[in-house]
Amino acid sequence: MVDVNRFKSMQITLASPSKVRSWSYGEVKKPETINYRTLKPEREGLFDEVIFGPTKDWECACGKYKRIRYKGIVCDRCGVEVTRAKVRRERMGHIELKAPVSHIWYFKGIPSRMGLTLDMSPRALEEVIYFAAYVVIDPKDTPLEPKSLLTEREYREKLQEYGHGSFVAKMGAEAIQDLLKRVDLAAEIAELKEELKSASGQKRIKAVRRLDVLDAFNKSGNKPEWMVLNILPVIPPDLRPMVQLDGGRFAASDLNDLYRRVINRNNRLARLLELNAPGIIVQNEKRMLQEAVDALIDNGRRGRPITGPGSRPLKSLSHMLKGKQGRFRQNLLGKRVDFSGRSVIAVGPTLKMYQCGVPREMAIELFKPFVMREIVAKEYAGNVKAAKRMVERGDERIWDILEEVIKEHPVLLNRAPTLHRLGIQAFEPVLIDGKALRLHPLVCEAYNADFDGDQMAIHVPLSEEAQAEARLLMLAAEHILNPKDGKPVVTPSQDMVLGNYYLTMEDAGREGEGMIFKDKDEAVMAYRNGYAHLHSRVGIAVDSMPNKPWKDSQRHKIMVTTVGKILFNDIMPEDLPYLQEPNNANLTEGTPDKYFLEPGQDIQEVIDGLDINVPFKKKNLGNIIAETFKRFRTTETSAFLDRLKDLGYYHSTLAGLTVGIADIPVIDNKAEIIDAAHHRVEEINKAFRRGLMTDDDRYVAVTTTWREAKEALEKRLIETQDPKNPIVMMMDSGARGNISNFSQLAGMRGLMAAPNGRIMELPILSNFREGLSVLEMFFSTHGARKGMTDTALKTADSGYLTRRLVDVAQDVIIREDDCGTDRGLLIRAITDGKEVTETLEERLQGRYTRKSVKHPETGEVLIGADQLITEDMARKIVDAGVEEVTIRSVFTCATRHGVCRHCYGINLATGDAVEVGEAVGTIAAQSIGEPGTQLTMRTFHTGGVASNTDITQGLPRIQEIFEARNPKGEAVITEVKGNVVEIEEDASTRTKKVYVQGKTGMGEYVVPFTARMKVEVGDEVNRGAALTEGSIQPKRLLEVRDTLSVETYLLAEVQKVYRSQGVEIGDKHVEVMVRQMLRKVRVMDPGDTDLLPGTLMDISDFTDANKDIVISGGIPATSRPVLMGITKASLETNSFLSAASFQETTRVLTDAAIRGKKDHLLGLKENVIIGKIIPAGTGMARYRNIEPQAMNEIEVIDHTEVSAEAE
């Protein structure tokens, strides 16, 4: 076998007849498969052992030679070679066709490659190939046109008119083959290039297409006549198996039926030709043979598909490759693996961050070979066979061995759907009883797991390298930050939040207030014995906590705090300030001075002068974790998280929060608020009946009134709530629920959406405490159903979006340290109207500067060029009043097939500079796709006159942007830079005209009457600026402005959608995707290069082609940038393997074969497909020479040996 890891590239071409013969081990002459009595393959049939190899290892068909010692001998009795049965997966046969047959991919594809080569229409080709018309091949001296079609009658008439042999006309694939042989590629190409100089319109488009195909044949060395088959390869029998079912019947692959039809028809044709049968019968048989081969290659592409039993269309060779169940996606990109298991998950609150609980019986099965090796090593058993029996019997001694084996051997846990890289993490296994996997509660957020019956899969990394990578790169304790935004992903939730919230509450006048303790232990003792309450404010000696970063003025004093906060601060990392207040100042700058007693001061006096602090909420805990990570990195953070979790669980149990109906408060003035709203609605309806407002206005006014009523109730609820109310505590701490849930319980449910998405005017006035009436209940079912269907649709849509994103960016890898570009991107805060969607500070963090940044007033250099901007530096730049900064960006990176470290910046998942080899494309795709399910599905209907457009938001808008579609509610943009001089309204056409005066001339733009204007007379506008509200069409913007403007616009638009839904995503991820959409240019004028006009090519390839021409003093080619949607960009990738495994498999392969494309295996998918280690991370060439050394050399028993011995 070829060593996959030594592959440099992979090429696909058309196979010549001689090539097909060289593959073949013999001709399949009979349609038989296996003998019904002996069940042995028939000679010269589709499963023949002589052609394809033996069905049993090292055994010929007749049984004369058995055993491996006869390896390579060809049996003199049956003619079968003694070898492994595995060769039946690789040996091919062939069928000699008695008449040429056209290949349906090349004749039927769009555009038809045969048609373009011959300059004939697909319809004409079809008539010839399927024997409906003759085609003139050589008119000789007659006035007939070459390639003209003649019907049967016309052909006879012409023969009589000009005499037999005066011209050559044929039908069928044979005629096409003759025509293809006559094509003079060089002459045709020269002629077309000449024609292009003057052609325009449709004629030019057709010439460019033909030139493309002919040039492909010319350059690849493929001959056009190979598109017609004279010999048909037969794929190996094990790839179209026939298996016996329990009832003695056989199940066979559809391909066998399709091959059988071809062989039957071919043999019948051979017999007819021998008998010199009448032409019409032969013709009919040839047509049937053509149809049989068509069905074998792509059943159903032309006419009705051939069906099997139950009128089910048979699966042809093309179907074996296509779609989710095809070869590419089912077997090459995703494989089933051994050493894996799956079970329901349960919570493991006692586990450490890096541990998971694995049921004993699962672990013994997963680690079986390792356990068996240890049994033999310890001499509990003499050989592997005995060891295997010992494990299967469940001998007592195996459990101790299992404990040893799993120590330090990480396992991988995966939860489907794996939306981002945190969907697979490594843990150290801990053996547990029971049958469920135990999962650490803090990693649930990364997996999006809960314990209502979710299942997870477990995998065992086997090799030393795999174990090392799992431990160093994938251990759950290492994954503190989310790759999408660099924020902690392991924030505590629910009980943990609630426990810490309860612990850090403060209360005035509780027992023990004003007591002073010498240290933590004394305070805890007082609390345990009932002398002090958890929430009572007490004093503690600062010197009992010497490791905290106190100011000098604070040492040796007494500090006012609560018993709960003493416990809370006890689990904090030592160098973190003592936390009294849930704010950033306390966290970063230290404990405020007001909590410290001056000598001789009365503690009660200080306590009375202090405000009651709010407890620590979920958000505050997140900030503490982020700060801890920033200062101490992963090890300390994960240990701290475990302490935080334990403390939270312990105290949420102690708090004993319960919820009863009495905990839902009653709002005293609810009736008044609702009566006022009813009164206002009545007035609005009255005004409408009098004709003072339109129906749209009335609808908006009514819905607004009810919305305001609901808000008034909500406001009243917040004002009157008791902070110790359990529901309020849950809501306020961020443990569960929000104000909207609370107001539905205690206020009113409010307005509901109708099935059509429009909001109904009748609100639900009741709340859940009072209970809903039957009608109200009925109304609310619409919303509930819509919620369910939306979620289901959204999940599928979001998953497909992620798949397309991954596909377009999977080959973007950090390939070098610095690309040395001199370009940069000028960034400022992203705004939407007056609202800031993303601040400059957020955009600067973790990026490199392109130019030095100076203080706008003093001129002092804040940071030099090409320096990394840290979080603190970003704050400093913004505080200095800088509004825009030029940074290194993925958009301007000059690295080929990837990005350099400096243009990318920091890796958000680690907080450090990104490493060479990081697969940033895939991470970007996951970061954008994973929150896709959180985005809404709706297209908002803004009822009312305000706008006549539907503003697309949420997931549909993201798809619109990435697919570069024309947006709904498109804005009119100006092509002129200048001033708006006039806006005139034309009532007759219901439009407005906007006039922009530029330096070179006046621009006139027609705008719909109802569109909302963004500009006024006198405004200065730049090229590409929007005159009306709405989304700009990016392709139009590209025509008016440059690539960078389009990239910046798309980046801002994506961020607006995500930020409006409260989802934060790092700019760099969007940059990676947008850059992939703009990586191609279209050649306009080839100049002196040998490029073809109209060709799509990578910018780097285009630059290379021009470089040589410019050096030699020729005219360089000109091009225009092209914006492609992600689906099209994926299909236009340089890798045909990646494109074929994505979509439109047959089209991609047809095209690649004609061009003789070479895949240089630069991306991830291509390497996964051929089974090579991916060129990212540790698989990158620069890291491949490192030899891992095990601490103690250990051998792992091969499974095949075990099964061989067991037999």
Curated annotation (Swiss-Prot):
Keywords: DNA-directed RNA polymerase, Magnesium, Metal-binding, Nucleotidyltransferase, Transcription, Transferase, Zinc. It is an enzyme of class 2 (transferase). Binds 1 Mg(2+) ion per subunit. Binds 2 Zn(2+) ions per subunit. One of its GO terms (cellular component) is DNA-directed RNA polymerase complex. It catalyses: RNA(n) + a ribonucleoside 5'-triphosphate = RNA(n+1) + diphosphate. Zn(2+) 2 binds at residues 819, 893, 900, 903. Zn(2+) 1 binds at residues 60, 62, 75, 78. It comes from the Bacteria. Mg(2+) binds at residues 450, 452, 454. GO terms for molecular function: DNA binding; DNA-directed RNA polymerase activity; magnesium ion binding; zinc ion binding. Its EC number is 2.7.7.6. SMART domains: RPOLA_N. GO terms for biological process: DNA-templated transcription. Pfam families: RNA_pol_Rpb1_1, RNA_pol_Rpb1_2, RNA_pol_Rpb1_3, RNA_pol_Rpb1_4, RNA_pol_Rpb1_5. InterPro entries: DNA-dir_RpoC_beta_prime, DNA-dir_RpoC_beta_prime_bact, RNA_pol_asu, RNA_pol_N, RNA_pol_Rpb1_1, RNA_pol_Rpb1_3, RNA_pol_Rpb1_3_sf, RNA_pol_Rpb1_4. HAMAP family: RNApol_bact_RpoC. Belongs to the RNA polymerase beta' chain family. The RNAP catalytic core consists of 2 alpha, 1 beta, 1 beta' and 1 omega subunit. When a sigma factor is associated with the core the holoenzyme is formed, which can initiate transcription. DNA-dependent RNA polymerase catalyzes the transcription of DNA into RNA using the four ribonucleoside triphosphates as substrates. This is DNA-directed RNA polymerase subunit beta'. The gene is rpoC.
